[in-house]
Design a protein with these regions (language model features):
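Trp/Gly-enriched beta-strand/coil motifs that build multi-repeat beta-propeller-like domains
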Residues: 1-201
Length: 201
């Protein structure tokens, strides 16, 4: 996954995990390639979901959220140089969610937020408080279990707001356009034939 600029050099980076739980940082070289990988952690195979929300605690550095199968959610704050500050627990019971999406600032308050889908297809927004925790949460959609994949699309339509993508059971790629207030102003199919992919980022 991409945490954004994780080492503070102004270039986007990539973090990968191997089969034994080793975590590695591939720093972007700014020209479409990578600098040599370096190890930044071990034991990360205890997590079933690892995502890069951006700067979740408001210190100017990009961070990582990781969930254990038992539902505990942890914040690993980045130190701005490709390493970590001490982790903090930011939630329990997150194992009821089968998709975690990091769209950035979804409600327009300047803080990073999180979207989560449960097994019944309900989609929730968890608004960040800008200090490594949550301000509130509420449901913003139903029927999202009809989608095989859900993810953050960035600003897909150029209106300055973060959007969300989904792939349905027929393989259609759908874009859901944010209204900037933790809601939607429309959706449309923007592609087909995406059903055979095993992962979409």
């Amino acid at each position: 996954f991409s945490p954004g600029d994780f080492d503070g050099d102004g270039k986007s980076d990539m973090i990968v995990r191997d089969s034994v739980g080793g975590l590695y940082l591939f720093s972007g070289d700014g020209a479409g390639g990578w600098k040599p990988a370096r190890a930044i952690g071990n034991g990360w195979n205890i997590f079933d979901s690892i995502i890069g929300p951006g700067d979740f605690n408001g210190d100017g550095n990009n961070d990582v959220l990781a969930r254990e199968p038992g539902g505990a959610l942890y914040l690993y704050p980045g130190n701005g140089a490709g390493g970590w500050l001490p982790r903090t627990a930011v939630g329990t019971g997150w194992n009821v969610m089968n998709a975690l999406v990091t769209p950035g600032d979804f409600n327009g308050d300047g803080n990073v937020d999180l979207l989560a889908r449960d097994s019944n297809g309900y989609l929730f927004v968890y608004t960040g408080n800008g200090a490594g925790g949550w301000s509130r949460s509420w449901m913003i959609g139903v029927g999202w279990n009809a989608l095989k994949y859900v993810g953050a699309a960035g600003d897909f339509n150029g209106d300055g707001l973060p959007d969300v993508y989904g792939v349905d059971q027929q393989g259609r790629l759908l874009t859901y356009y944010s209204d900037g207030r933790a809601g939607w102003k429309g959706s449309e199919a923007v592609g087909a034939g995406f059903g055979w992919f095993t992962a979409i980022f």
